[in-house]
């Protein structure tokens, strides 16, 4: 299957995503014909001011916090007297999950966001956002709490599965596309959790000590891009304290950075229970307390009556939200509940999941499986019987339906093939079934959830099951369904490993599509998989999880793959890594300066030397020259491109790196500065494998 072919040059160059540059081709427009008729921000703001001037004090105070009822967990009621519509909020990183006091309507359970990140495909992220927003409207809401763009600082984080991974550049590109997809439907995106919501342990009170440069270069870029590029309409402030101040009452984070520096004109909501004050939160720039009013209720009225909070501040809070709702067409219209197109969205979920799976190991080209040559299969393990539809907590979605793994595998096999399915609880029975089968497939996984961090070991018994089955059958395939990285003590004993993440409601079909070659895997890891717990920040309790009061981000810029390279520690699987059933080569790198003070055009060939079509993610990294700021990471992702190539095809890939790609945050200048010196440009298929390199000197 990997026989080399004569390469067929293709003249047209593929221009892809790179530093602060949008994908050139195939982008969905963020403006529909209907949206073009909506008021501009200036017009909406003027109308909102007129509206607020007509409100009574009681009406104003009732509009700055949420309430909940028997069917909806958080919403702001409308004011019929003034034709002010309801704001109905839906959780959303993994699909429309309205939540509620005892009720939640089903929706499409999409693959987990970490799976979406593994696709390394902004266009897929855009479509994902569009479809999730479409269901938000179908379920009667107008704000979708999505995406979650916190950096996966530690693999133990309980919400890594909700995130887009460990690299700020990758997260930024996916965030912008996802938000544009959401807001193209008229649904308000609510990007979260600002900022540095990186662990669940002590999340409500922990003080994170983060230096300014690290905050700006690692934890803020995706939020900055969401505001400046995607023009996100709303933002959620997070639980932790950053350098002594709670996020939701930090004048620096909310007022100075978001509103003044980034020119954010939307509204800011709190995470649930993340408000700790009345006066400080209002004056910092918080607009809406959710889910209900504790500090923005009677306490706020007292603060206004005493003169500690001017009524003008309350007026501005309302103007900001009403203006955005007007811009998005919600004044004069309410979302109408309508049926979700189950089959259409299910097909999309299946495709998304398959494109996100990462082939970690494939010795002897065991995969893809040829159903014509398989007489028997043993499908084993706790995740063989039910679909891994998602993680737990607020992002949980009740699926419209689910496809069990055994159903997906059974449908992919010939009718005469014997399929034995066991959950693995009886290891002896599983071993016996594996010994008698031609192929053994072991499906294992974890259950990440909001509110608690976790270890990076598989749950008890799963490693032992894999080891026992592998000993009984040399053709054992392990399928992981995890929300983050896990240790693999059995890795050397199995020929094939597929990371499927939480595939969503189409689990069984999507996994079978990859195992049997209907889909050629093209996913790449958005997080690093460590060899041992000691290789993570957990080796230093001050860095993670902290002492219960403080956690120190003393690793600075060396987060994720940067830390492994800087310390000379080999990961189990590197950031950006992922195999294919095809084989690719990189060649002919050219780096052309673009402007005297930073910027470059990076071009190279990607060739498919296999006999089948496949997709490769070309990745561009920079190594900065030594600068006054010091402690430069050994490499930083600055561009990537997912390119699909037919057998024997090669294409020129061009990526435009702008000045920002060559810049660092200067605390002294309080801004971005271009680093003078020689930058090392590296191109390859992972952070660990960059066969092409060249230099770019900046004066």
Residue map of PLM features:
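Intrinsic low-complexity/disordered segments
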Residues: 2-3, 28, 32
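Glycoside hydrolase catalytic-domain context in secreted enzymes
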Residues: 30-665, 671-673, 678-688, 696
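Bacterial N-terminal signal peptides
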Residues: 15-25
């Amino acid at each position: 299957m990997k026989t080399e072919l004569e390469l067929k040059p293709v003249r047209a160059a593929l221009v892809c995503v790179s530093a602060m540059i949008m994908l050139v081709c195939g982008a969905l427009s963020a403006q529909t014909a209907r949206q073009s008729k909506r008021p501009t921000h200036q017009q909406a703001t003027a109308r909102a001011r007129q509206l607020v001037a007509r409100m009574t004090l009681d009406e104003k105070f009732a509009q700055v916090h949420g309430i909940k009822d028997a069917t909806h967990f958080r919403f702001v009621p409308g004011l019929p007297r003034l034709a002010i519509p309801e704001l109905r909020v839906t959780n959303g990183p993994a699909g429309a999950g309205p939540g509620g006091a005892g009720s939640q309507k089903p929706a499409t359970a999409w693959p987990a966001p970490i799976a979406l990140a593994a696709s390394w495909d902004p266009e897929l992220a855009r479509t994902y956002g569009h479809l999730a927003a479409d269901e938000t409207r179908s379920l009667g809401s107008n704000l979708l709490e999505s995406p979650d763009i916190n950096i996966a600082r530690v693999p133990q984080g309980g919400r890594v599965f909700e995130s887009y991974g460990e690299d700020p550049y990758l997260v930024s590109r996916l965030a912008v596309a996802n938000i544009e997809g959401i807001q193209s439907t008229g649904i308000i995106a609510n990007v979260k959790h600002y900022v540095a919501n990186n662990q669940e342990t002590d999340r409500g009170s922990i003080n994170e000590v983060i230096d300014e440069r690290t905050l700006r270069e690692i934890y803020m870029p995706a939020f900055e891009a969401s505001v400046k590029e995607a023009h996100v309409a709303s933002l959620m402030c997070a639980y932790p304290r950053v350098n002594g101040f709670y996020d939701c009452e930090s004048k620096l984070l909310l007022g100075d950075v978001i509103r003044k520096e980034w020119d954010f004109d939307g509204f800011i909501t709190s995470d649930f229970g993340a408000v700790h004050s009345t006066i400080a939160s209002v004056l910092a720039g918080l607009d809406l307390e959710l889910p209900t009013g504790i500090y923005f209720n009677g306490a706020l009225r007292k603060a206004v009556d005493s003169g500690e909070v001017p009524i003008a501040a309350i007026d501005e809070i309302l103007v900001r939200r009403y203006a955005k709702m007007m811009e998005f067409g919600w004044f004069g219209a309410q979302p109408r509940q309508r049926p979700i197109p189950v089959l259409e969205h299910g097909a999309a979920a299946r495709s998304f999941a398959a494109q996100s799976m990462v082939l970690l190991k494939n010795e002897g080209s065991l995969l893809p499986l040829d159903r014509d040559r398989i007489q028997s299969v043993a499908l084993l393990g706790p995740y063989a019987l039910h679909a891994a539809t998602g993680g737990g907590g607020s992002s949980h979605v009740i699926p419209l339906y689910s496809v069990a793994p055994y159903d997906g595998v059974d449908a992919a096999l010939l009718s005469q093939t014997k399929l034995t399915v066991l959950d693995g609880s009886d290891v002896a029975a599983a071993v016996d079934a594996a010994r008698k089968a031609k192929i053994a497939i072991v499906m294992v996984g974890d259950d990440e959830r909001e509110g608690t961090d976790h270890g990076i070991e598989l749950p008890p018994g799963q490693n032992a099951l894999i080891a026992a089955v592998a000993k009984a059958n040399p053709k054992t395939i392990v399928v992981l369904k995890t929300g983050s990285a896990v240790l693999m003590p059995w890795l050397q004993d199995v020929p094939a490993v597929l990371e499927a993440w939480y595939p969503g409601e189409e689990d069984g079909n999507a996994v079978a599509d990859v195992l049997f070659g209907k889909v050629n895997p093209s996913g790449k890891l958005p997080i690093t998989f460590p060899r041992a717990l000691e290789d993570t920040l957990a080796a230093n309790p001050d860095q993670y999880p902290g002492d219960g009061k403080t956690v120190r981000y003393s690793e600075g810029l060396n987060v994720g793959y940067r830390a492994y390279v800087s310390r000379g520690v080999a990961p189990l699987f590197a950031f950006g890594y992922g195999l294919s059933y095809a084989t690719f080569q990189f060649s002919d790198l050219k780096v052309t300066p673009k402007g005297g003070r930073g910027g470059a055009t990076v071009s190279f060939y990607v060739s498919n030397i296999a006999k089948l079509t496949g997709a490769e993610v070309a990745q561009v990294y920079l190594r900065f020259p030594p600068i006054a700021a010091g402690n430069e990471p050994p490499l930083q992702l600055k561009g990537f491109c997912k390119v699909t190539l037919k057998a024997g095809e090669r294409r020129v890939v061009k990526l435009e790196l702008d000045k920002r790609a060559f810049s660092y945050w200067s605390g002294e200048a309080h801004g971005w500065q271009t680093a003078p010196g020689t930058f090392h440009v590296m191109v390859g298929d992972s952070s660990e494998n960059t066969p092409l390199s060249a230099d770019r000197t900046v004066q």
